[in-house]
Amino acid sequence: MHEQLSPRDQELEARLVELETRLSFQEQALTELSEALADARLTGARNAELIRHLLEDLGKVRSTLFADAADEPPPPHY
């Protein structure tokens, strides 16, 4: 036999369904945010590595372009 729910029980049932629905959406949002954070961390790590390499390359270029003046031969008028 199937009993009819009282109005109070129906209200509680509706509230429970609403809360379960909200929880489901929040869990989905949390999963998406977690994935986005993981992607951002990977991107940040890659960018940090790229910057490190670029700074090394820049240092090499600077040392080539702006060599120590003591290493340069004197100008011809000396």
Swiss-Prot record:
InterPro entries: SlyX (IPR007236). It comes from the Bacteria. Signal peptide: none annotated. Pfam families: SlyX (PF04102). Belongs to the SlyX family. HAMAP family: SlyX (MF_00715). NCBIfam families: PRK00846.1. PANTHER family: PROTEIN SLYX. This is Protein SlyX homolog. It comes from Xanthomonas campestris pv. campestris (strain ATCC 33913 / DSM 3586 / NCPPB 528 / LMG 568 / P 25). The gene is slyX.
